[in-house]
Amino acid sequence: MEESSAAKIQLLKEFKFEKILKDDTKSKIITLYGKIRNEVALLLLEKTAFDLNTIKLDQLATFLQDTKLVENNDVFHWFLSTNFQDCSTLPSVKSTLIWPASETHVRKYSSQKKRMVCETPEMYLKVTKPFIETQRGPQIQWVENILTHKAEAERIVVEDPDPLNGFIVIPDLKWDRQTMSALNLMAIVHATDIASIRDLKYKHIPLLENIRNKVLTEVPKQFSVDKNQLKMFVHYLPSYYHLHVHILHVDHETGDGSAVGRAILLDDVIDRLRNSPDGLENVNITFNIGEQHFLFQPLTNMNA
């Protein structure tokens, strides 16, 4: 394990920066484009949240170092400081390396404007569904690894092994597992024939209700959170095409991740299925899409 870990850390050291893809000052994440061993790599650097269990608030003079005054006005004083850092207890940066990175990864993590699209059933069948088929199989091997316990097995929070109505809940790697207001989990279904909400039909209501009920029961047992502090939703378009449900703390600030035009509440999906027994393949769905997305041009052309 140590040798494997050292080899992965070495990859980070071999990253050769070429350009900045995105600088998000709100989320404090910068996305860098570069190469590792002549293959495209993306490196996401994120400022970590303060761990109030580690910082000794009664010893701030030790925590805040090299402090300088920026400005003061009446009762207000602004300072800049470096802070004491320790990788085990007080890391300051979380890094995510994607290597080798595909063109899909590059497009996804690039800075881009978004547009609203109303996708009709015809547009879905002619444009979106064929695209989704290209994003299955090897493109989501990492999902298969989780479902078969080949990877991240020690991170599983909840599991129901039933092949039809079962799922696995794991923490999203964006969450530090310490800041409860930033709680971020993901329920991945065992069923392999549901790529997105477009594949959902009336018969899938027991699956969705099972996710909702077990999450609301089990997650509060493991984390300091009440069930009415959890919000569950799906994305359309999703970031990968194997049905999964996002589970976040209600106070979580997620940018556009849980915003109108991207997220659909799980309870709303269940209600829509009750009212549309034939499924969600035959309804209009309006969502936002980035201009770098492979589907942007064909969908907007049909929407014109």
From Swiss-Prot:
User: Molecular function terms in GO for this entry?
Assistant: 5'-(N(7)-methyl 5'-triphosphoguanosine)-[mRNA] diphosphatase activity; RNA 7-methylguanosine cap binding
State any GO CC term: cytosol
| Catalytically driven reaction(s) | a 5'-end (N(7)-methyl 5'-triphosphoguanosine)-ribonucleoside in mRNA + H2O = N(7)-methyl-GMP + a 5'-end diphospho-ribonucleoside in mRNA + 2 H(+)
Motif Histidine triad motif per record, residues: 242-246
- Active site annotated at which positions? H244 (nucleophile)
- Keywords for the protein's UniProt record, in alphabetical order: Cytoplasm, Hydrolase, Nucleus
Q: Where in the cell is it found?
A: Cytoplasm; Nucleus
Q: Which residues cross the membrane?
A: none
What is the predominant subcellular site recorded for this chain? cytoplasm
Q: Is Endoplasmic reticulum tagged as a keyword?
A: no
- Its Enzyme Commission number(s) read 3.6.1.59
InterPro entries (alphabetical): DcpS/DCS2 (IPR008594), HIT-like_sf (IPR036265), Scavenger_mRNA_decap_enz_N (IPR011145)
- Pfam families tied to this protein: DcpS, DcpS_C
Q: What does this protein do?
A: Decapping scavenger enzyme that catalyzes the cleavage of a residual cap structure following the degradation of mRNAs by the 3'->5' exosome-mediated mRNA decay pathway. Hydrolyzes cap analog structures like 7-methylguanosine nucleoside triphosphate (m7GpppG) with up to 10 nucleotide substrates (small capped oligoribonucleotides) and specifically releases 5'-phosphorylated RNA fragments and 7-methylguanosine monophosphate (m7GMP). Has no activity towards mRNA molecules longer than 25 nucleotides.
Family note = Belongs to the HIT family.
Q: What is this protein called?
A: m7GpppX diphosphatase
Native species = Schizosaccharomyces pombe (strain 972 / ATCC 24843) (Fission yeast)
